[in-house]
């Protein structure tokens, strides 16, 4: 697991209070992890703070799974 993936997983576990074994790449924040719309906004803000990046609204709308977040953040931090 990449450093980005580990950091994303830690943030998701802390913000949503879910078991680590549920936080897998294809886990949907809302459908699988029980997040609501406010939770997803807070997750995006936490990702921005942790990785020192800005996630535009149009990109944030496409981040619906743990894997989506990891992929976006790996690209954003590699630039």
Curated annotation (Swiss-Prot):
Protein keywords: Cytoplasm, Fatty acid biosynthesis, Fatty acid metabolism, Lipid biosynthesis, Lipid metabolism, Phosphopantetheine, Phosphoprotein
InterPro entries: ACP, ACP-like_sf, PKS_PP-bd, PP-bd_ACP, Ppantetheine_attach_site
Places the protein is found: Cytoplasm
Pfam families for this protein: PP-binding (PF00550)
Gene Ontology CC terms: cytosol; membrane
Modification after translation: 4'-phosphopantetheine is transferred from CoA to a specific serine of apo-ACP by AcpS. This modification is essential for activity because fatty acids are bound in thioester linkage to the sulfhydryl of the prosthetic group.
Domain Carrier: 2-77
Metabolic or biological pathway: Lipid metabolism; fatty acid biosynthesis
O-(pantetheine 4'-phosphoryl)serine PTM sites in chain numbering: 37
Endpoints of the signal sequence: none
Gene3D superfamilies: ACP-like
GO biological process, one term: lipid A biosynthetic process
Superkingdom assignment: Bacteria
Protein family per UniProt: Belongs to the acyl carrier protein (ACP) family.
Function statement: Carrier of the growing fatty acid chain in fatty acid biosynthesis.
Name the UniProt record assigns to this protein: Acyl carrier protein
Organism whose genome encodes this protein: Methylocella silvestris (strain DSM 15510 / CIP 108128 / LMG 27833 / NCIMB 13906 / BL2)
């Amino acid at each position: 697991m990449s450093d980005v993936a580990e950091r994303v997983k830690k943030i998701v576990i802390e913000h949503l209070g879910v078991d680590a074994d549920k936080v897998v790449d294809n886990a949907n924040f809302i459908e699988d992890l029980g997040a609501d719309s406010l939770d997803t906004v807070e997750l995006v803000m936490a990702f921005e703070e942790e990785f020192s990046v800005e996630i535009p609204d149009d990109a944030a709308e496409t981040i619906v799974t743990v894997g989506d977040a990891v992929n976006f953040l790996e690209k954003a931090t590699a630039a």
